C-alpha cells in the first residue's frame, strides 16, 4: 500500500517524502525505481501547514484560522528517508537517487525477513512489525557496546543476549557490578566467587596492586624476587604435601614480609624495603575480603554452556577493579595458551561483559581493568575473547576502547553530549540515526555493526524471569517497615 511520494531533490543516501498519514520514525519502507527495489528507513517525521508556516508573524491571523473546523485547515506530513540498500540478495548501496513522484510503501514482513532474520540468535522484533531480528554471532568477536540512559533496558538486553547464547551452547562471563544477575532466574547460571589467589598473579600484576611502579627500580626488584621465591616455595610445598591451603591463607603475607626483610638487609635498601613492607600491609588490609589462596585458578571455574556470573555487589571499587582486571588477564592469556597448545588453557571462546564500564573503563582514570580490557579490544578477536561493555554514561568511556567496539546496541539516550560522543566514536552510526535516540521507548534500540546487515531499529525481547536489580518500591517498603515496627512494638509490650 502506497503511503506517500518522494518530493524535492534526493541523493543516493536520503530523500524526502510527503505522506498520506502519520508514520512513526523507525519504520522501513520500499521505493521501486529504475528496475530496483530499494529499502529505506524513516528517520524523522514532521508536520506543518502552508497557512501556518514559520514565516507567520500575526497571532490574530492564527486565532481566526483556528476558528475554522480542524479538517478545513490544510496541513502536510513529511518524512526523511535514509536509503539503505537494494533488495537484490547482495544488499548493495543504491547507485541512483529516486526522482520526485516515486511512490513510497511500507516494507512487507517477507521483504524485511530476508534482511533482518538471517542471523544466528533472535534478540527481538523490528519496531512496527512481527519480523524477528537475529544477530550474527561471529562478529561479536569484534566486541559490542550496550549503551543507554538509566532505566532504558540495558540489563534486560544483557539478560536476553546471555540467555540466547547459552541456549546454543555458548559461554559468557558477566562481571555483575550491582548483583542483578547472580540471584536472577536466568537459566544455566554458574556463580563464581570474586576472589584473588596470589599464586596466580603475575609479578607485574601484584606490583601494580601494591602500587609499585616499574620505574621504582629497587622496590620493584625487591617484590619481584621475594614474590617469585615465595610462590615457588609454596607450589613445591603443596606438591609435596607439606602444607595446607588453609594454613597458607593465614600466613602468606607474614611469610612474604619475612622474605622482604631478608632481601632488604642491605643498608642501602632499607628505605625501599620499609616502603615495600608498608605497601604489602596496606594491600593485605585493603583486599582482605577477596584474597584467598584456596580459590584456585578462575579459568577452571568458567563453564561452557553457562552464564558465568561474578557477583561484585558487596565490594568497593578498588576490589572490583582488581578482580575484573585479573580475570580478564587470565582469560586472555589462557586463550593464548590454548592457541599454542590445544590441551591447555581455556578451551572454548568466551564473551566477557563489563558492567558500569564508565567506572572501570573511564577516560579520566587509569584503572587496572582498562589495561586488560584494552588488550582484549585489540587482540581478543584472534583468540576467541569477546568484550561487551555496558554503560549509561557513554561520554565517560575511554575513547580508544569504545571506538573498538565494532558493534553497538544503543537504547534510549537523552543527554546531547552522550549522543555526540557515541556518534564521534562510531564509524557506522549516522547523524540522523543518532538524532532519533532520545525518542526511543524503553527496550527499543538501534543496532549497528557487523552483527546485523543494516542499521536495525528493534524492540528487544522482554526477559520473562526475575532480575535482582529493579528499583525498590518505596511505598511498599515503607509500609512493610511500618508494619514490622508495629509488630516489634506489640511484642515488647507483651514482655
Swiss-Prot record:
Molecular-function annotations in GO: ATP binding; ATP hydrolysis activity; helicase activity
Subunit and partners: Interacts with Rad50 and Mre11.
Amino-acid positions noted as binding ATP in the UniProt annotation, renumbered to this chain: 142, 151-156, 459-460
Domain of life: Archaea
Pfam families associated with the record: DUF87 (PF01935), HAS-barrel (PF09378), HerA_C (PF05872)
Function field: Involved in DNA double-strand break (DSB) repair. Probably acts with NurA to stimulate resection of the 5' strand and produce the long 3' single-strand that is required for RadA loading. Has DNA-dependent ATPase activity and bidirectional DNA helicase activity. Loads on either a 3' or a 5' DNA tail for subsequent DNA unwinding; has no activity on blunt-end DNA.
Conditions for induction: Part of the nurA-rad50-mre11-herA operon, these genes are cotranscribed.
Keywords for the protein's UniProt record, in alphabetical order: ATP-binding, DNA damage, DNA repair, DNA-binding, Helicase, Hydrolase, Isomerase, Nucleotide-binding
Listed InterPro entries: DSB_Repair_Helicase (IPR053460), HerA-like (IPR008571), HerA_barrel_dom (IPR018538), HerA_C (IPR033186), HerA_central (IPR002789), P-loop_NTPase (IPR027417)
Stated family: Belongs to the HerA family.
EC numbers on record: 5.6.2.3, 5.6.2.4
Record's catalysed reaction(s): Couples ATP hydrolysis with the unwinding of duplex DNA at the replication fork by translocating in the 5'-3' direction. This creates two antiparallel DNA single strands (ssDNA). The leading ssDNA polymer is the template for DNA polymerase III holoenzyme which synthesizes a continuous strand; ATP + H2O = ADP + phosphate + H(+); Couples ATP hydrolysis with the unwinding of duplex DNA by translocating in the 3'-5' direction
Entry keyword annotation includes Thylakoid: no
Organism the protein comes from: Sulfolobus acidocaldarius (strain ATCC 33909 / DSM 639 / JCM 8929 / NBRC 15157 / NCIMB 11770)
Mechanisms controlling activity: ATPase activity is slightly stimulated by either circular single- or double-stranded (ds)DNA with a weak preference for dsDNA.
Consequence of substituting residue 154 to A: Abolishes both the ATPase and the helicase activities
Keyword Nucleotide-binding annotated: yes
Group of enzyme by EC: isomerase
Name of the featured protein: DNA double-strand break repair helicase HerA
GO BP field: DNA repair
Amino acid at each position: 500500500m502506497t503511503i506517500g511520494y518522494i518530493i524535492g531533490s534526493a541523493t543516493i543516501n536520503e530523500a524526502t517524502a510527503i505522506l498520506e498519514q502519520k508514520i512513526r520514525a523507525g519504520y522501513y519502507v520500499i521505493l521501486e525505481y529504475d528496475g530496483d527495489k530499494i529499502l529505506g528507513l524513516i528517520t524523522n517525521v514532521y508536520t506543518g501547514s502552508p497557512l501556518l508556516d514559520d514565516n507567520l508573524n500575526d497571532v490574530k491571523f492564527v486565532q481566526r484560522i483556528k476558528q475554522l473546523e480542524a479538517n478545513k485547515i490544510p496541513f502536510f506530513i513529511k518524512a526523511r528517508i535514509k536509503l539503505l540498500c537494494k533488495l537484490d540478495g547482495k544488499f548493495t548501496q543504491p547507485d541512483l537517487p529516486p526522482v520526485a513522484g516515486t511512490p513510497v510503501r511500507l516494507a512487507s514482513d517477507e521483504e524485511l525477513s530476508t534482511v533482518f532474520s538471517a542471523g544466528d540468535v533472535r534478540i527481538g522484533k523490528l519496531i512496527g512489525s512481527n519480523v524477528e531480528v537475529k544477530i550474527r554471532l561471529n562478529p561479536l568477536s569484534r566486541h559490542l557496546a550496550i549503551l543507554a540512559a538509566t532505566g532504558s533496558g540495558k540489563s534486560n538486553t544483557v539478560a536476553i543476549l546471555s540467555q540466547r547464547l547459552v541456549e546454543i551452547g555458548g559461554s559468557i562471563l558477566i562481571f555483575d557490578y550491582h548483583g542483578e544477575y547472580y540471584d536472577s532466574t536466568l537459566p544455566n547460571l554458574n556463580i563464581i566467587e570474586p576472589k584473588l589467589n596470589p599464586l596466580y598473579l603475575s609479578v607485574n600484576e601484584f606490583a601494580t596492586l601494591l602500587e609499585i611502579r616499574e620505574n621504582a627500580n629497587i622496590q620493584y626488584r625487591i617484590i619481584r624476587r621475594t614474590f617469585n621465591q615465595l610462590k615457588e616455595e609454596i607450589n613445591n610445598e603443596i606438591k609435596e604435601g607439606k602444607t595446607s591451603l588453609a594454613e597458607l591463607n593465614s600466613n602468606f603475607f607474614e611469610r612474604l614480609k619475612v622474605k622482604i626483610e631478608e632481601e632488604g638487609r642491605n643498608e642501602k635498601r632499607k628505605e625501599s624495603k620499609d616502603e615495600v613492607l608498608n605497601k604489602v600491609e596496606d594491600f593485605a588490609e585493603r583486599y582482605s575480603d577477596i584474597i584467598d589462596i584456596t580459590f584456585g585458578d578462575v579459568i577452571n571455574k568458567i563453564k561452557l554452556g553457562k552464564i558465568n556470573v561474578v557477583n561484585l555487589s558487596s565490594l568497593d571499587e578498588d576490589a572490583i577493579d582488581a578482580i575484573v582486571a585479573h580475570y580478564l588477564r587470565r582469560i586472555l592469556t589462557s586463550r593464548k595458551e590454548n592457541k599454542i597448545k590445544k590441551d591447555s588453557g581455556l578451551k572454548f571462546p568466551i564473551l566477557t561483559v563489563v558492567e558500569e564500564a564508565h567506572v572501570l573503563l573511564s577516560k579520566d582514570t587509569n584503572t587496572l581493568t582498562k589495561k586488560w580490557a584494552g588488550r582484549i579490544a585489540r587482540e581478543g578477536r584472534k583468540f576467541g575473547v569477546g568484550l561487551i561493555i555496558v554503560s549509561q554514561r557513554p561520554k565517560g568511556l575511554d575513547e580508544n576502547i569504545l571506538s573498538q567496539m565494532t558493534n553497538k546496541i544503543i537504547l534510549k539516550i537523552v543527554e546531547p553530549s552522550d549522543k555526540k560522543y557515541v556518534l564521534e566514536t562510531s564509524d557506522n552510526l549516522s547523524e540522523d540515526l543518532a538524532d532519533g535516540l532520545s525518542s526511543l521507548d524503553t527496550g527499543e534500540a538501534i543496532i549497528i555493526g557487523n552483527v546485523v546487515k543494516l542499521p536495525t531499529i528493534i524492540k528487544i525481547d522482554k526477559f520473562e524471569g526475575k532480575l535482582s536489580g529493579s528499583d525498590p518500591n518505596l511505598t511498599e517498603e515503607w509500609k512493610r517497615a511500618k508494619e514490622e515496627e508495629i509488630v516489634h512494638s506489640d511484642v515488647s509490650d507483651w514482655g
